Regions:
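Glycine-rich ThDP/TPP pyrophosphate-binding loop and its adjacent helix/strand module
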Residues: 3-187
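C-terminal intrinsically disordered, low-complexity extensions immediately downstream
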Residues: 180, 187-210
Length: 210
């Protein structure tokens, strides 16, 4: 989990006075892990410039988050107990997410301390390519797919006068960039085994130090 790294990054920015803000993304399942609670407590205590964004997609791998969590909002309800002022937002509403994120980042940058945003959304596919997702009701999947934020926001933009051809071109460029990155990764050399133990320490080494 990146919680500790996020707090470390935020502390570094606070110490150096750079005005930088760390943004840490997590899933709903991570809210049941001890490191999540430790990170929120430390961030609030030290008033770190960090924004935690929980993508609550309703499932903790293969388990509905509601069946293993005692509170209805697994991230926001916990964050409040650590002194944060959490925000719950429709994670499929592009502009709503943008607005709450901008506000949280602005507060953190201006000394307002950490923030947590719980974005309610849905995982369209399984947890991995090996997961067909049969444990989810078909009606539930169809309901959420109908709220897919990409076509929904495309409709918003075209309704405001954006040329559909421009949106097609943007989508094509994004797909091309992903395809290019995939091919470059496949064509690249395999990492050398000895690199697995480098950069353990800040100086790039890995030898044990007494």
């Amino acid at each position: 989990m990146l919680f500790r790294s996020a707090n470390g990054s935020a502390w570094s920015a606070l110490y150096r006075g750079t005005g930088q803000v760390t943004v840490c993304f997590l899933g709903d399942g991570a809210t049941n892990i001890g490191a999540f609670h430790e990170a929120l407590n430390l961030a609030a205590t030290w008033q770190l410039p960090v924004v935690f964004i929980c993508e609550n997609n309703q499932y903790m791998e293969y388990t509905p988050i509601g069946s293993v969590t005692a509170v209805p909002r697994p991230a926001a309800d916990r964050a409040a107990s650590y002194g944060l002022d959490p925000v719950v937002v429709d994670g499929n509403d592009v502009e709503a997410v943008y607005e709450v994120a901008q506000a949280a980042i602005g507060r953190a940058r201006n000394g307002g301390g950490p923030a947590l945003i719980e974005a309610l959304t849905y995982r369209h596919g399984g947890h991995s390519r090996a997961d067909p997702g049969k444990y989810r009701p078909d009606s539930e999947v169809k309901q959420w797919l109908a709220r897919d934020p990409l076509p929904a926001y495309r409709a918003v933009l075209t309704g405001r006068g954006t040329d559909p051809a421009l949106l097609d071109a943007i989508e094509a460029r994004a797909a091309e960039a992903v395809d290019l990155a995939t091919e470059e990764a496949k064509a690249g050399p395999q990492p050398r085994l000895e690199l697995a133990v480098t950069n353990v320490w800040a100086d790039g080494g890995h030898a044990w130090r007494n």
